[in-house]
């Protein structure tokens, strides 16, 4: 099928690149799940950094951030532990190393993984002022509906202070939010898009 070649080709390309750089890397494979509308198997990579294993799924990252005019690279699946990756990946069907730490998760390394709502608000104010796109990961407990509503309110409030409306996209399973602001032309409802990674492998 057409969906199979995409992730397999990307995972093999990542392995070739990492092999060339001397980074240990294998290909992971999980099953399909017709009940969930996942009609193909999926492949990605497991890498080893300083003796610790992490999941790296370039296919899922490549499928995100295509809303609006923005096509910036995403890192939601860059060095995840088992707990995080299997929130939206099916179980493995071939043996692979356990990935038990998240220390090198991209957003954590870049200090873009927040546990306090005030940090989100502070960065939202900066984003509204500078007119940029901002992506962050939430790790202040589970991203429940109540927590999400609080974060969305703060992001919108920061925009209102600069007479701007927020455009927000959400990768809920990985607790990653991305937003920017547009000029406020009257009472426009803030736009929230729920992104689903790797839509190409679903029915």
Describe the residue ranges of each PLM region.
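N-terminal accessory/pre-domain segments preceding catalytic cores
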Residues: 1-2, 81-203
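Alpha-helix N-cap/helix-initiation motif
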Residues: 3-7
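Hydrophobic/aromatic-rich core segments of domains that either
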Residues: 8-82
């Amino acid at each position: 099928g057409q969906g199979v070649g995409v992730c397999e080709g990307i995972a093999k390309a990542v392995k070739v690149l990492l092999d060339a750089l001397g980074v240990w890397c294998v290909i992971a494979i999980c099953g399909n799940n017709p009940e969930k509308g996942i009609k193909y198997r999926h492949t990605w990579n497991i890498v080893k950094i300083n003796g610790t294993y992490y999941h790296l799924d370039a296919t899922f990252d490549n499928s995100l951030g295509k809303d609006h005019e923005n096509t910036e690279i995403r890192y939601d699946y860059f060095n995840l532990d088992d707990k995080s990756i299997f929130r939206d990946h099916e179980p493995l069907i071939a043996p692979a190393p356990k990935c038990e730490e998240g220390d090198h998760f991209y957003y954590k390394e870049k200090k873009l993984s927040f546990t306090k709502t005030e940090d989100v608000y502070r960065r939202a104010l900066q984003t509204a002022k500078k007119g940029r796109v901002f992506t962050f990961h939430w790790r202040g407990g589970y991203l429940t509906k109540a927590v999400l509503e609080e974060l969305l309110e703060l992001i919108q409030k920061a925009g209102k202070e600069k007479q701007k409306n927020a455009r927000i996209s959400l990768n809920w399973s990985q607790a990653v939010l991305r937003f920017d602001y547009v000029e406020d032309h009257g009472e426009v409802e803030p736009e929230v898009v729920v992104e689903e990674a790797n839509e190409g492998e679903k029915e």
